[in-house]
């Protein structure tokens, strides 16, 4: 049976390869995603990554750390890419973006079954030029 560690590694590999069909095979049929930007279920999770890949043609996901605790796996990732397409209504800026995430999954039946994450979305939208950078003045 596939371990949580293997699933978390494969997650990054499939996204970097822009292979959302392979990514979808990692998700349990009853997948629950607690990410507020994604629609419910497997389809919603695939759609949010489709949006990233479409907006950043060189989108890649790098594994920073994985902690496997049996039925729970935690991954820290860095996503990088050049913002060349519209993302969540933000027009292309051609800026290099970098997003850091902490993803927590519940593993069931050898698949990713439930997901929570923390993202630096404020910084991402600042990098895209959607909102001004904050300064200490």
Go through the PLM ranges and name each one:
Residues 1-137:
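C-terminal and inter-domain tail/linker signature
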């Amino acid at each position: 049976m596939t371990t949580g560690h293997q699933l978390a590694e494969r997650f990054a590999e499939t996204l970097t390869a822009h292979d959302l069909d392979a990514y979808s095979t990692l998700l349990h049929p009853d997948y629950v995603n607690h990410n507020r930007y994604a629609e419910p279920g497997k389809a919603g999770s695939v759609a949010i990554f489709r949006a990233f890949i479409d907006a950043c043609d060189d989108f890649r996901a790098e594994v920073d750390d994985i902690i496997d605790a049996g039925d729970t796996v935690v991954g820290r990732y860095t996503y990088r890419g050049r913002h060349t397409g519209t993302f969540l209504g933000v027009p292309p800026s051609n800026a290099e973006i970098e997003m850091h995430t902490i993803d927590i999954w519940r593993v069931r039946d050898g698949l990713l079954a439930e997901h929570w994450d923390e993202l630096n979305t404020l910084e991402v939208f600042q990098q895209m030029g959607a909102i001004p950078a904050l300064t200490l003045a």
